[in-house]
């Protein structure tokens, strides 16, 4: 059977000339893992299942590859290392597979205990919520769950030109305000973050500040990891926050993007990353303790994760496994350039949590430089996004 003949697989997201909103990962759960795949720690313990599972669905003109694992096993860059090694091995290039590091010692703890640079206090500590504020934050979050139960997870295809227009719009708005002089740097990630924050702010029933929660990857922040001479297939992400006032969040893209750039630049320095790690090492309970939340207790929490650096479309090459067939017009529609290359990918939790909302997963670019984003949002926010994308 061809993939377009399958009632579910034919609806997998495809690249479009204009921006589009398409079905989310939950519509394709059957292709991700077997029906009884472990979804909790208890499931892994009682089923004696392996930490990493592979689920293959084959069609005459396409193959769907599903990987499932607990997030404690690895992050997106660990997944990149795994898929890169897999591609090299299939091509008979085992000698090029990087050395696997960190199996017997924790390089992150070692870096925290032996800093190579100046020691600083954690700047986020000044914004950490006190007990009373944390209670207010929890009560507000609980109220939001009760009054806004409906959320929808969808996938967005954003053409290269659309994202570049967002970035240039942000830069132009800052230049018009004569901010930061002439040398204004706003990344595509900053622009997309600002775009998501603004959509949530404009769809909020009342003005509220927003705290964007980012995943900051240690592999790019600590010299001992950058120059390690191999790869770490594990989770090396810590939290970073962007704090946006209610007024700024509902305003122009430029100031939001600039604040995101400023906050992340401040928190991503080696001394600040080490300060964060030292606090975790000194009090491991902070990993699960809600007191690590920072910012305004009245803020809307908006988690972001950006996978663009993983460059899955560039490093995944399963062409040695292709038995026959050539690229078709359908391959081009899906963003593929050669048989055995990645045309689309997404991620989902095998266990849906009712508290998941206001989440953006920037999955990165396809072969045509289109950006793909999966988001879990309230219907009013989706209305704002569709209007902004020019869909309605």
Name the predicted role of every residue range:
Residues 1-30, 109-138, 324-340:
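Charged, glycine/proline-rich intrinsically disordered loops and linkers
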Residues 1-66:
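Acyl-thioester-dependent condensation/acyltransferase catalytic cores
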Residues 23-43, 141-148, 155, 323, ...:
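Long, low-complexity, polar/charged, intrinsically disordered or flexibly structured peripheral segments
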Residues 1-24, 147-155, 221-225, 242-249:
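Acyl-group handling in specialized metabolite and lipid biosynthesis
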Residues 153-155, 159-392:
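Acyl-CoA-dependent O-acyltransferases
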Residues 1, 101-172, 202-206, 214-224:
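Short amphipathic alpha-helices and their capping loops
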Residues 44-117:
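Active-site-proximal acidic secondary-structure segment that organizes catalysis
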């Amino acid at each position: 059977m061809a993939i377009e003949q399958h009632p579910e697989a034919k609806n997998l997201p495809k690249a479009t000339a204009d921006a589009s909103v398409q079905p989310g990962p939950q519509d394709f759960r059957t292709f991700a893992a077997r029906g009884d795949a472990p979804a909790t720690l208890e499931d892994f313990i009682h089923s004696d299942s392996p930490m990493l599972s592979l689920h293959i669905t084959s069609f005459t003109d396409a193959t769907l590859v599903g990987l499932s694992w607990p997030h404690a096993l690895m992050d997106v860059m660990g997944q990149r290392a795994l898929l890169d090694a897999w591609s090299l091995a299939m091509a008979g290039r085992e000698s090029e597979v990087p050395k696997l590091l960190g199996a017997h010692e924790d390089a992150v703890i070692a870096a925290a205990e032996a800093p190579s640079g100046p020691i600083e206090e954690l700047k986020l500590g000044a914004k950490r919520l006190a007990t009373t504020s944390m209670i207010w934050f929890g009560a507000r979050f609980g109220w939001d769950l009760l009054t806004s139960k409906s959320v929808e997870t969808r996938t967005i295809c954003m053409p290269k030109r659309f994202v570049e227009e967002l970035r240039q719009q942000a830069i132009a708005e800052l230049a018009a305000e004569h901010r930061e002089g002439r040398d204004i740097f706003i990344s595509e990630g900053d622009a997309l973050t600002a775009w998501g924050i603004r959509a949530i702010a404009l769809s909020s029933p009342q003005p509220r500040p927003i705290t964007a929660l980012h995943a900051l990857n240690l592999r790019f922040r600590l010299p001992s990891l950058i120059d390690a001479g191999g790869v770490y297939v594990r989770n090396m992400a810590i939290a970073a926050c962007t704090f946006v006032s209610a007024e700024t969040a509902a305003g122009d893209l430029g100031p939001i993007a600039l604040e995101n750039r400023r906050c992340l630049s401040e928190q991503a320095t080696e001394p600040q990353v080490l300060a964060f790690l030292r606090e975790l090492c000194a009090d491991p309970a902070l990993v699960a303790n809600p007191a690590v939340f920072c910012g305004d207790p009245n803020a809307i929490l908006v988690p972001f994760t950006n996978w663009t650096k993983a460059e899955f479309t560039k490093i995944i090459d399963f062409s040695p496994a292709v038995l026959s067939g050539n690229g078709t017009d359908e391959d081009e529609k899906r963003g593929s350039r050669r048989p055995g290359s990645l045309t689309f990918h997404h991620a989902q939790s095998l266990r849906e949590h009712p508290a998941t909302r206001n989440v953006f997963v920037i999955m990165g670019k396809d072969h045509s430089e289109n950006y793909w984003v999966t988001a879990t949002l309230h219907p009013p926010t989706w209305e704002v996004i569709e209007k902004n994308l020019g869909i309605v």
